Amino acid sequence: AMVSFLHYWALTEFIGLADHLGEWEDAKKYKAAAQHVKEVCNRELWDGEWFIRGITASGRKIGCQEDAEGRVHLESNAWAVLSGAADAEKADAALQAIDEYLYTPYGLLLNTPSYTVPDDDIGFVTRVYPGLKENGAIFSHPNPWAWAAACVRGRGDLAMKFYDALCPYWQNDKIEFRESEPYSYCQFIAGKDHSAYGRARHPFMTGSGGWSYFAATRYMLGIRPDYDELKIDPCIPADWKSFRATRVFRGASYEIIVNNPDGVMKGVKEIRIDGVPSDRIKPSRTGSRHVVEVTL
């Protein structure tokens, strides 16, 4: 299922590129394909409360409500929302399922409950020791996908909750048990179905550092480049009053000041560049410096 949602996301990216280049026939083709993929995903992969993980070669669904083990999975539900493929109501329900079933104080479980019986129809994951690595652990790499997904739905509170849980810094008072540095993401943390629940393993051996930075800066802080502009669309906890960030975009430096006087989680009310109201942040001269004030 995750790959189906990635397919949809890739198609939407191609649509944006085709529109930018004026390739209207390509854009039309990709839009039709994306709509088809979206309809099929919402029809075939939705299980009533969350999205399933996949379908085996024999036609059996993985990660559905009838499953005693491996009922809820992180990757498919996060990407259903992050890609934009999920209908609004389903997207909110998928986030709720992630929060309700997969959240732990150490991060989000990859799946739950862990598999305890080998099942070759499903595959390798059912032979991994319960609560470790791919079988019910807090696998770091996919966690940031859920942070970004929460931001897509305007849930800055949920994004921050998920971010804080995985952040190594907040686990440093448990260092004797965690057995990992407070400045490194780990490949995984033992899940709740393991006797060493909360113990981290394989620091630095993970792609989660890059994904964490990507999700935190481009979705939570909401600062991300586009073809013709630098976009700023934060999604933060309502109790954040302000934040600052510096972003170099195509050779120019932007000092970004975001103020949140009304205590909202998402929604830009006004942008000022060097004191002048603007609706877009266009590329500027290389070496130039600018102050961007954003009011939510």
Q: Which residues does each PLM region occupy?
A:
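Functionally constrained cores in energy, signaling, and assembly domains
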Residues: A1, H7-Y8, F14, A18, ...
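Charge-dense, low-complexity intrinsically disordered segments
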Residues: A1, L21-W24, K28, K133, ...
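Secondary-structure capping and boundary motifs in well-ordered enzyme cores
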Residues: V3-L6, A33, C64-L74, A86-K90, ...
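Catalytic cores of carbohydrate-active enzymes
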Residues: L6-I122, D164, P168-A196, V248, ...
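Amphipathic alpha-helical repeat scaffolds
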Residues: W79-L82, P144-A148
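Non-catalytic C-terminal accessory modules of carbohydrate-active enzymes
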Residues: E100-T104, V128-N135, W145-L296
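Amphipathic, soluble alpha/beta structural segments
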Residues: N111-N143, A245
